[in-house]
Amino acid sequence: MKTLILSASIGLAGCALALFSRQRSVAQLNTLFDWLGRGEASLVEHFLSGLGVVLLSIFLVVLHARMSTRQAWPKAWLRAGWFVALRSKVFRATRPIYIVHWSAVIATVYVLASCQWELGQAQAGRAFQTLQLSMDIAGSATACLFLMLLMRADYRRARQSRSLVLGR
């Protein structure tokens, strides 16, 4: 749970900083982003938004899976059985060892949406902004690597329990 809180706070901070910089509401933040982006503050904004979107999406996926543990209303036995089976599949898919897989899927969707946006901008007569797309990719990849580092202990624990069960 600490991992989820950490990823949610980093994701929220990244999205908030990118939004504040985009709105030009904090002069010191704009100066810092201009310095970090070497005159292109939008590059840092795209990096932070790529990082924040992936981490917040992972937090929402896992939070939804954790919150849906009970049936909210009585159901017929067939629907209740279907709900229990679906819930067990969702829980298996949102175990900590699968969070990195989920982040890779979400990062891929985000990068494809960014690429589609840049292609749409290029078709509208504006230039295709390769640097901004590459910063979206870098932010998403950084989020995946960050989650992979945070989940390393869970991977190790799962590998050890699997080897005990399989008799290796």
Q: In which residue ranges do the predicted regions lie?
A:
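Bulky hydrophobic segments
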Residues: 1-168
